[in-house]
Amino acid sequence: MTAIDPQSLEKHTPMMRQYLTLKAQHPDMLLFYRMGDFYELFYEDAKKASELLGISLTARGKSGGDPIPMAGLPYHAVEGYLAKLVQLRVSVAICEQVGDPATSKGPVERKVVRIVTPGTLTDEALLQERQDNLLAALYQGKTGYGYATLDVASGRFVVTELANTEALEAELQRTNPAELLYSEDFSQMSLIAGMNGTRRRPEWEFDYDTCQRMLLNQFGTKDLKGFGIEDARLSLQAAGCLMQYVKDTQRTALPHINSIVRFNQSDSIVLDAATRRNLELTVNLQGGRENTLASVLDNTVTPMGSRMLQRWIHQPLRDHDIIRARQASIAELMMTGDFETLSEDLKALGDVERITARIALRNARPRDFARLRQALTLLPQLQQTLSAASAPHLKYLSQVIGVFPEEVDLLSRAVVDNPPMLIRDGGVIREGYNEELDQWRKLSEGATDYLHELEAREKEQTGISTLKVGYNRVHGYYIEVSRRESDLVPLSYQRRQTLKNTERYIIPELKEHEEKVLSSQGRALALEKQLWEQLFDLILPKLHELQDFAQASAELDVLCNFAERAESLNYHCPELSSISGIHIEAGRHPVVEQVSQSPFIANPVTLNAQRKMLIVTGPNMGGKSTYMRQVALITLMAHIGCYVPAEQAVIGPVDRIFTRIGASDDLASGRSTFMVEMTETANILHNATPNSLVLMDEIGRGTSTYDGLSLAWSAAEYLAKQLQAMTLFATHYFELTQLPEQLSNVENVHLDAVEHGDSIVFMHAVQEGAASRSYGLQVAALAGVPNCVISAAKHKLHQLESRDHDVQQNTEQQGTQQNMSFVPSAPSPAVEALQKLNPDELTPRQALDYLYNLKKLAL
């Protein structure tokens, strides 16, 4: 059954009518329907859950004349299944029994009490500790896009306006939302086609007036001018829809969402989607998190510090004052060595940011309060270390972190040292906190002593050695006697239960005592839950200060981490200049140097007004791509305030970093490798400025030699002459090394290699001037191309070089000059085939077949 007609509900059983009514209210979610000790799913939900969770798909009789597909899972194991569904970006509505079965006529009353969606998680068991979990909303208008993100687990609410699809694509990649809301009129579906967790919302949810009222009500303000978003109409519409969705799913007040920040792309260095991917900032090209910039830089000691560091990496700043404040803090932490002491203290803070959010949502658990108490207790010690700080930013962070003596006192008096996971069974509130609770507990505990006395007395009076007093939830208190001594039981004993080897009885005195015990236990538990709820009310007035403390502690963690990384990895403080250019001495790739088995060869780079472009040549595997990437990464690191892997770095204003490195087919959009390459190139040529850093690697490979060379030459010329962007342009078209002869701001550099017999040694050192050759055949041999293919290729290369030499001599004798001086001659089809050959992708068999094809082409 794929859909339920409301008109046919009467055909179903009362229970299924209840289920179908609830399911109709949550059509795009799996409905976990509580049945005793299980959550059950029916119809399409059951089939989907069976497939996703690997649970059995069965049937539960018939309803409406059709078999009902059914799947179930134990209620006590639900968190594990929820975690798996959340990872798959599937939302779940959890339906519980809220009525009393004893008084219910028909099905027990049920209602959805919790909604779990990928973007609204707050439970630590469902969240990735060191990654933000964002809910996003997207609205398309005539002038661009409005985009809003909210981290429900922290309360961080950010909006931005984007002018075009390229900017939107970059922002989607930067934020990587767990769940994305978009309007039914959204037209650029190709941008989100591959994303999980997308939710199509009706257009009316993005109504401007409705969204504005929603935000004003949430923040308790008369207008939005104080947040700087009053003129950001599109992002305001996205934010309003997002806020309504959160209210619908959380079903509680959201006091921790108390502000909204507008992100302006002009405040940070713009990184497009290709650049974030190619530089492997937080995710590598295979989709993992190892061997990324974040994996090297992140030695933070708190989860909230780690999340902040990743946000910084994806959002390098352009404001030199903020960067210098961070640098000064790092310098002082290194000079005093305080980063080690502070890191030890910070480590014990845990994830205060998310704990505070759970308190605001009133779904914190007892251990959250215990962890908060531990964190707040450590603050005087942290402040003592910071008290001697002279760096202005460290002083500011110390002031924001503050101390919370009243909250420490409250939590110390109220919560036991090692509380249970849940409040459900009590045992959370400390003795002495509430006199009435202590009295009820003593009554309950005194009852235990009474039971021991009763057991001893009855044993003595009856002479039954096996007699003992027990308790279970079904039958309450009872007297248990072995079967062999049951004939000694007095007539006043009333049999309650017969087991295999024992008999169980009750007596009026024990029944009366049971009522007293259960009454005292019940009253104690009810009062404890009431006191527990009051704890939230007592902590929440300090919510904003606690949020600020968490934010400042996270930043202090990142700065201490930067100090540790600088000291451990031999990083140096970069100098920020107001003059355009990049000068790096002995720069190193921060990731490659950590994973390389051999010592990393440091290299310099200089880009300035007189030297805007470097044409980078050299052999494959010689290090061209590594060299270019390290320049970009050092530049990025400098703009997050981090020290850099270089002996010296002077970096001027940078507005964007572009990379056109490597490409693959975009099958989802129907674009070939060459089309992807040209699209990325077009984006660079349209948007680069004199303050942009551009990395271009092997432009023009995916087409004919003439086409590729012409495109590469023209793109390089446009970048250097018209745009004057700071550019590293790697190529195997040696004709491009003639470009410096025509443009004064272009120079050649190369990565050297040395031949030794038939082998080659890569020096990985950058030298001035152009490379003499590309060593393609030697690299092919290293890759394992069969010797017969290498020999044939050498012979063919000699023939081609001889022919080109003859053509050149004839041209010189005739005194003519080709219009395109950088094209020596028209190559044969065999040459073009060799140009397109990628030896790394050939098996021995394919290489042999290729050789035969080359022979045919040469004839």
Swiss-Prot record:
A Pfam family: MutS_II
Q: Which GO terms describe its cellular component?
A: cytosol
Q: Which Gene3D superfamilies match?
A: 1.10.1420.10, 6.10.140.430, DNA repair protein MutS, domain I, MutS, connector domain, P-loop containing nucleotide triphosphate hydrolases
Assigned keywords, A-Z: ATP-binding, DNA damage, DNA repair, DNA-binding, Nucleotide-binding
Q: Which GO terms describe its biological process?
A: mismatch repair
**Sequence segments annotated as region (Disordered):** 803-829
Q: Which domain of life is it from?
A: Bacteria
The chain's disulfide connectivity reads: none
Composition-biased stretches (Low complexity): 808-819
What are the TM regions of this chain, as residue ranges?
Answer: none
| SUPFAM superfamilies according to UniProt | DNA repair protein MutS, domain I, DNA repair protein MutS, domain II, DNA repair protein MutS, domain III, P-loop containing nucleoside triphosphate hydrolases
Which residues bind ATP per the record?
618-625
Q: What GO terms are given for molecular function?
A: ATP binding; ATP-dependent DNA damage sensor activity; damaged DNA binding; mismatched DNA binding
Under the heading SMART domains, the entry gives: MUTSac (SM00534), MUTSd (SM00533)
What is stated as this protein's family in its record?
Answer: Belongs to the DNA mismatch repair MutS family.
Q: What does this protein do?
A: This protein is involved in the repair of mismatches in DNA. It is possible that it carries out the mismatch recognition step. This protein has a weak ATPase activity.
Q: Under which name does UniProt file this protein?
A: DNA mismatch repair protein MutS
Which source organism does the UniProt entry give? Shewanella pealeana (strain ATCC 700345 / ANG-SQ1)
Task: Give the lineage.
Answer: Bacteria, Pseudomonadati, Pseudomonadota, Gammaproteobacteria, Alteromonadales
